[in-house]
Regions:
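Hydrophobic ligand-binding cavity/cleft-lining segments
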Residues: 1-46
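Short beta-edge strand/loop motif at the mouth of beta-sheet-based domains
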Residues: 15, 33-70, 80-82, 155-159
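A structural signal for short, well-ordered beta-strand segments
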Residues: 16-18, 101, 114-116
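Conserved strand-loop elements at the edges of beta-sheets that form or border functional pockets
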Residues: 20-22, 53, 76
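Hydrophobic pocket/interface hotspot
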Residues: 27-31, 59, 74, 85, ...
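Hydrophobic-ligand binding "helix-grip"
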Residues: 49-50, 64-109, 117-120, 146
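A conserved amphipathic terminal alpha-helix motif
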Residues: 118-159
């Protein structure tokens, strides 16, 4: 029988706010796509993510042949202003997360407030350093803004 030393429970909170020159509907649709088919690493590698966009729906990485990774469940969804996910996300260790995307219209722009809170036996490199969760979410929020603004411009401001 193996016994290990006590591990430290850590928590973190990532908060990102972004003003996006696109309608709230376009931004919400873009978030759903970014979490699903357009989810990729900064080097452009697809993560093959699937999002079932309804209460209780799964968010998971589909590697085919009944293989993959469960990331979370849709805890709340109120199109086009709220998407909330709970689950372990990318963490393959004892941890739980809550992720919120909240959208509000402000003066012709959409304000995206993104929050990721987590707690568990989280290694310090997840919280700090080059490959931290903060850097990963910064990339994703930036991609949402770029894609939503590109869609808004391509649609001629419709929606």
């Amino acid at each position: 029988m193996a016994v290990s030393a006590e591990q430290e429970v850590r928590s973190f909170e990532v908060v990102k706010e972004e003003k996006i020159a696109a309608s709230v509907e376009v931004v919400f649709e873009t978030i759903l796509e970014q979490m699903g088919p357009y989810n990729e690493t900064p080097d452009g590698t697809s993560l093959a993510m699937k999002l079932e966009a309804w209460p209780g729906g799964r968010w998971y990485r589909d590697l085919g042949k009944d293989s993959g990774h469960f990331w979370g469940h849709v805890q709340a969804i109120k199109p086009p202003t709220l998407l909330e996910i709970c689950g372990p996300l990318f963490m393959s260790f004892p941890a739980i997360s809550n992720v919120q995307y909240r959208l509000t219209e402000e003066g012709g722009l959409t304000r995206l407030k993104f929050v990721h809170r987590a707690m568990g036996l989280i290694p310090s490199e997840v919280i700090e350093g080059e490959r931290s969760v903060h850097n990963g979410w910064s990339y994703i929020v930036r991609r949402i803004r770029e894609r939503a603004e590109g869609r808004q411009n391509a649609d001629g401001g419709k929606k």
